[in-house]
From Swiss-Prot:
Name of this protein: Phosphate import ATP-binding protein PstB 2
Family annotation (Pfam families): ABC_tran
Compartments where located: Cell membrane
Keyword Secreted: no
Catalytic activity: phosphate(out) + ATP + H2O = ADP + 2 phosphate(in) + H(+)
GO CC annotations, alphabetized: plasma membrane
E.C. designation(s): 7.3.2.1
InterPro entries for this protein: AAA+_ATPase, ABC_transporter-like_ATP-bd, ABC_transporter-like_CS, P-loop_NTPase, PstB-like
Length: 262
C-alpha cells in the first residue's frame, strides 16, 4: 500500500479524522474508484451523494476495510483515521471495524433478543463489566430505550423497520466506536422512521464522526455539514453542504442536484 500524504482539501473543509489520498479501487480488472483525495472532518456528518453506480458505497467500505471481504478487490493509495494508516501492514481489520462501525441499507438485527443484539459485541470482546449498563446506554444513545425498555427479552425481529435500524445503531454504539458509516440507512423506511434516524444523526455527531451515503438530496441538505459529490467513480467536489447546494464549483454538481441527470 502506497502512502501518499497531502494537505487537506481546499474549499472550506476542515482538517479531520479521515485523510484519503490518491485512492484507487479495482474489482479484478475493473476500476471502480479513481484517484479519490479528500479529508473527512471529525464530529460532523459528511454526506456522499451521486447517481447509482458512481462508487459511493464502494468508497464508504474503504473507510473500514469492508472491501477486504470482496473477492478480487484491490486498493491503492492512502486511507488514514486520526493519523493511523488503516491499510498499513499489521493493521487489524477487525479492530478497525469496531472503531469504525457500519450501518447498512436494510436493518440486519441478529435472530436474538433486543438485549442480546446490543450485548453481543461487548460480550464477544470479553467485556466483564455491567452489561445491563452498556445495553441501556447504547439504547438511550440510539433513542430507542423508552420504546423497548419493558421488552428487552423479546425477539429483535418483532420491532418495526425503523426500530430495527435504531437497534443496529445501538449495537454498533455498544462497542464504543469513533465513527459510524451509514449506507443509505433510511432508504427502506417510512417518512416517520426516516425522521427519527435523521434526528439521531444530528444528535450523535456531537460524539461521533458520521459518513452518510444517501440518494436523497433533501436528506443530505437537512442533516449533513459537508457533502461530497461522486460521479463515475471520481470525486467531483466536496465542500460545506450549504455551498454545495447553493453555489457548487462544478457544473456537473449543479446538474445533478437540480435533477438534470442521475
Amino acid at each position: 500500500m502506497a502512502v501518499v500524504l497531502a494537505s487537506p482539501a481546499a474549499g472550506g473543509v476542515a482538517a479531520g479524522g479521515f485523510v484519503v489520498r490518491n485512492l484507487d479501487l479495482f474489482y479484478g480488472t475493473h476500476q471502480a474508484l479513481h484517484q479519490i483525495s479528500m479529508t473527512i472532518p471529525e464530529r460532523a456528518v459528511t454526506a456522499i451523494i451521486g447517481p447509482s453506480g458512481c462508487g459511493k458505497s464502494t468508497f464508504l467500505r474503504c473507510l473500514n476495510r469492508m472491501n477486504d471481504l470482496v473477492p478480487d478487490a484491490r486498493i491503492q493509495g492512502h486511507v488514514s483515521f486520526r493519523g493511523q494508516d488503516l491499510y498499513a501492514p499489521g493493521a487489524d481489520p477487525v479492530e478497525i471495524r469496531y472503531r469504525i462501525g457500519m450501518i447498512f441499507q436494510k436493518p440486519n438485527p441478529f435472530p436474538k433478543s433486543i438485549y442480546e443484539n446490543v450485548a453481543f459485541g461487548p460480550r464477544i470482546n470479553g467485556y466483564d463489566g455491567d452489561l445491563d449498563e452498556i445495553v441501556e446506554g447504547a439504547l438511550r444513545r440510539a433513542a430507542l430505550w423508552d420504546e423497548v425498555k419493558d421488552r428487552l427479552r423479546k425477539p429483535a425481529l418483532t420491532l418495526s423497520g425503523g426500530q430495527q435500524q435504531r437497534l443496529c445503531i445501538a449495537r454498533a454504539l455498544a462497542v464504543n466506536p469513533e465513527v459510524l458509516l451509514m449506507d443509505e440507512p433510511t432508504s427502506a423506511l417510512d417518512p416517520i422512521a426516516t425522521g427519527k434516524i435523521e434526528e439521531l444523526m444530528t444528535s450523535l455527531k456531537q460524539e461521533y464522526t458520521i459518513v452518510l451515503v444517501t440518494h436523497s438530496m433533501q436528506q443530505a441538505a437537512r442533516v449533513s455539514d459537508y457533502t461530497a459529490f461522486f460521479l463515475d467513480g471520481r470525486l467531483v467536489e466536496m465542500d460545506r453542504t450549504e455551498r454545495i447546494f447553493s453555489t457548487p464549483s462544478d457544473r456537473r454538481t449543479e446538474d445533478y442536484i437540480t435533477g438534470r441527470f442521475g
